[in-house]
Amino acid sequence: QLKHKITNQGVLNLGIGNNRVTVPGGFGALAKERFDRDILMQSGVKKVIIFEGINDIGAAKSGNSETVARQIIESIQGMVRKAKARKKKVYLGTITPFKGAGYYSHFHEAARLYVNDWIRSQAKKVDGILDFAKLLQDPNDDRRMKREYASNDWLHPNPAGYKAMGI
C-alpha cells in the first residue's frame, strides 16, 4: 500500500534497530533527539514517516501503560510539529502487534493500543496514517502478527512483512 503513495521517489531510511523515542538505553541517541539532524536537515526530504514506540513499550517494565503511551505520544507530537514547521508531509505508522515476543504482556499491549488509537485519531492533522498494525495483524488474534509476516521473535516483521508494509 505504501509503495503506491510514494512511487518514483528516493527513500532515506534512518531507522536504527533497538532505537527508542523516550527511554535511554537502546542503540544511539533517542529518535526525538536525532530527528532534526537525521531527518529534517537532510537535503531533499519532503515526506517523513514516523514509525516509533515499540522499543519504548518493551523497555517499560511496569507502571501505568497510559503513562508510557503518553510519553511516546508527546515525543511523536514534537516530531510532527518540527516536520510541519519545515513544510514536510508527515505520515504516522501504527505500532505492529507483538504477542509472542519475549516482553509481551497485557501491560505492554495496553500501551500499544493507546498509542495506536491516538495515531489513528490524527488523520486530519497529518498527511496520512499508515496502519501497519491492521495490515500485519492476525485476523484471529489482532495482538499477534500473521504468521506469514512475522519473524521468529514475533516482534519484527520478516521480509514478506516488510514488503507488505512497503519498506
Question: What function would you assign to each model-found segment?
Answer:
Residues I76-K84:
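Surface-exposed amphipathic alpha-helices with a cationic face
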